[in-house]
C-alpha cells in the first residue's frame, strides 16, 4: 500500500474502533439493566439506616440520593 492509501484508511479504522467501543459499552449497559437493576433498586430501598432517623443510608449524601432516585425512575419508566 502506498502512503496515500494508508492515510485514507486510517480514519475508517479509528471510526470502526470507536463504534466497537460504543457497542461494547451499550451491550454491557443493557445486560446490567436487565439483570441487576431490579435487585439494586430493592437493595437501595430496603436497607434502613442504623440511626433510626427514618433516613436510608443513601439519603445522607445529596449526590448519591439524586443518583438512586434517577435509578428508581429509570427502572419504573421501563414498566410504564
Swiss-Prot record:
<keyword id="KW-0812">Transmembrane</keyword>
<feature type="transmembrane region" description="Helical">
    <location>
        <begin position="12"/>
        <end position="32"/>
    </location>
</feature>
<protein>
    <recommendedName>
        <fullName>Uncharacterized protein YGL194C-A</fullName>
    </recommendedName>
</protein>
<keyword id="KW-0472">Membrane</keyword>
<dbReference type="GO" id="GO:0005783">
    <property type="term" value="C:endoplasmic reticulum"/>
</dbReference>
<dbReference type="GO" id="GO:0016020">
    <property type="term" value="C:membrane"/>
</dbReference>
<keyword id="KW-1133">Transmembrane helix</keyword>
Amino acid at each position: 500500500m502506498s502512503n496515500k492509501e494508508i492515510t485514507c484508511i486510517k480514519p475508517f479504522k479509528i471510526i470502526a474502533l470507536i463504534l466497537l467501543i460504543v457497542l461494547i459499552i451499550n451491550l454491557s449497559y443493557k445486560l446490567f439493566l436487565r439483570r441487576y437493576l431490579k435487585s439494586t433498586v430493592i437493595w437501595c430501598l430496603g436497607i434502613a439506616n442504623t440511626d433510626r432517623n427514618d433516613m436510608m443510608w443513601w439519603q445522607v449524601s445529596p449526590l448519591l440520593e439524586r443518583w438512586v432516585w434517577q435509578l428508581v425512575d429509570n427502572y419504573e419508566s421501563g414498566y410504564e
